[in-house]
Amino acid sequence: MGACAEYVCLPAQPEDGALAIKPTNMTYEEAAAVTMGGLEALSFVRQGNIQSGEKVLINGAGGAIGTFAVQLAKSFGAEVTAVDSGEKLDMLRSIGADHVIDYTQQDFTKRGRTYDFILDVVGKSSFAGSMRSLSPDGRYLLAVPGLSQKVRGRWASRTSNKKVTFGAAHPNSEDLLFLKKLIEEGKIRSVIDRCYPLEQTAEAHRYVETGQKAGHVIITVGHEGA
């Protein structure tokens, strides 16, 4: 997963790794995206213990993890607010976001709204502001926390009813099969921005580093076009 190689060694037994047969309604490129984004998103959304009808905000919703997190939260019955740059908002609506916020125009922590679960995929929102944006018993998950956020998060969890947790995904076949079922039911899908041939891997990385990608960038072997 995430390897720029023509071949990869996998465990002999499916239970020893994250292995599943490709969904019949997906291309190989779309299926590749599930393993790098879908599995992490599922782990984070489950850690959020989302209940049907709850309000969920996802910061960094337009990336590889975020696009799956939006769809998974919706499949769990949540009302989802997606935060990202303006050019990604239409895409986020198309995958089910109920509300969208352009972070270059609005700071979600200053809108006076509260959420039952906030998932920060990118780690760039204000910690104090995000805590204020939680409901009294809200949960806040940081996928890429810094040291200061870890210290403040642990303290906040001990001194209030609000809970702060940190991202830790452990891919396994059971989760991959769960995602496969949702895909085959048409409840979630991969969002692919561009495909690059293996020979243009460096160019693909440069594009990703611009921060402009929506969803996934895929490296292909035997490339047949973007």
Residue ranges and their predicted role:
Residues 1-60:
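NAD(P)H dinucleotide-binding glycine-rich loop of Rossmann-like/cofactor-binding domains
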Residues 3-6, 85-93, 150-153:
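Short, glycine/polar-rich helix-capping loops at beta-to-alpha or helix-loop-helix junctions
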Residues 8, 41, 73, 92, ...:
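Terminal peptide-recognition signature
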Residues 28, 55-58, 74-129:
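Adenosine-nucleotide cofactor-binding segment
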Residues 38-39, 60-67, 123:
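Glycine-rich NAD(P) Rossmann-fold beta1-alpha1 loop
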Residues 68-72:
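Rossmann-fold NAD(P)-dependent oxidoreductase module
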Residues 84, 122-188, 220-226:
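Glycine-rich phosphate-binding loop and adjacent beta-alpha segment
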Residues 187-191, 203-226:
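C-terminal capping/lid region of NAD(P)-dependent oxidoreductase domains
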